[in-house]
Amino acid sequence: MTDLRELFSPTRLPGLSAHGRALLRHLREHPQAPRFRDFSGHRLGLAERWQARARHAWWQRRAAPDWLAGEPLPAWVGPFVARCAHGVDAHAGKAALPFAQLPTMDRHALATQLAAHVPRSLPLDELICFSTSGTTGHPLRVPSHPRVACDYYAHHRRALALFGIVPKAGVGDVGIVLAGFQQRCFTYVSVNPLQRECGLAKINLHPGEWRHPGDRAAYLDAMAPELISGDPVSLAELLRLGLRHRPRALLSTSMALSAGLRAELEAAFACPVLNLYSLNEVGPVAVEVPTLGGFVPLQPRLLIEVVDDAGRSLPPGERGEIVVTGGFNPWLPLLRYRTGDHASIVRTPQGLMLQGLEGRAPVRFRGADGRWHNNIEVTRAMAPFALVRFALHQRADASLVLRVDAHEPLPALAARLRAALAATFGDTPIEIAALRADDKVRQYTSALAGAETAR
């Protein structure tokens, strides 16, 4: 039996209406509902909701910065740097430096000196710290706040608008389902106070979290969410469920989404699939628009650079590490923060765009003829396949191991995968194996000397 005091907690859900209460009970107590393990809520009072609406309206009217290296900085950057220099211990003394000479910061600095990066003047009574995985970098706790969680909504709306979608869910509707697929994850129901208390559910599609195997499809069909968000692992699981419901859009975050899987999802659900480039430290950075050939930046107050190993901004079209300044989280102002991801940045008639986006440090792989190949060549070779995830490793003897997570049987897929890699690497020995890790894995690794260049 649901603990209604917890479900309707005025601390978590201030101002909850009668129709909001009814929707929460429907989400949680439906006969096919999963085992919800937690309680959560927006924690926004009336004044904070109006402030959020004002912020969101301002963002909707502003474009992302149209700035490239060597051009005059946007007007807001100078004051932002000054506030960081005077109010954030980690940035003390930086106000007098030209922007191009500001040192870069990285995930290691946040992992080891997090308190020094939180502004001294901000209240800490409602501070939230989210833990992030360390499988692709240093384990990290990200300081946040209920208003920050609310502001993700505004930037997702900006992304949806690029595909002609304006969310319509309202009273009695389920606006979004956040779908995971893990042995165990945080699951709850809530409402969106900025969209007439439409419903939100964070669910785990792992079969062990449901009473019966068929309940997953039955529950999603009954809730009929306007949007479904997940990562390629959980979205691929949706393909196996036989859903009748068709959301207006799917949002993919957290991991790289292959072009093949996106095409299969779009065909199955007859809706766009948004491939979001998003980080826990920054929030949604950009969204891929395939017709434009790259990722379109989303945040009006996030300056994006592409830099070399020494932290120097690179000219348009040159490939380097993505560095960001600004963001919408006041509790974690970022000043030339190295994301660990790589791309080039160009100006198009539609504005700035990130092209060739790849996560984490580049890795080179050696072919049978001794030539080196960038990992982006591997990404392109794998793009036609509807893979949930893949990871490529080169052993010390130069042989390759490709591990894949796919809903197509591996024996039927292996020959085509091997042929796709052989087109780049020649007759290098290639082993194909299943990828069964429950969490994120590093996509590209090598035991060969010279495969990776340290910063």
What is each model feature region?
Residues C150, A154, I176-V233:
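AMP-binding/adenylate-forming
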Residues Q195, H245-P247, T291-F295:
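Short, hinge-like loop/turn segments at secondary-structure boundaries
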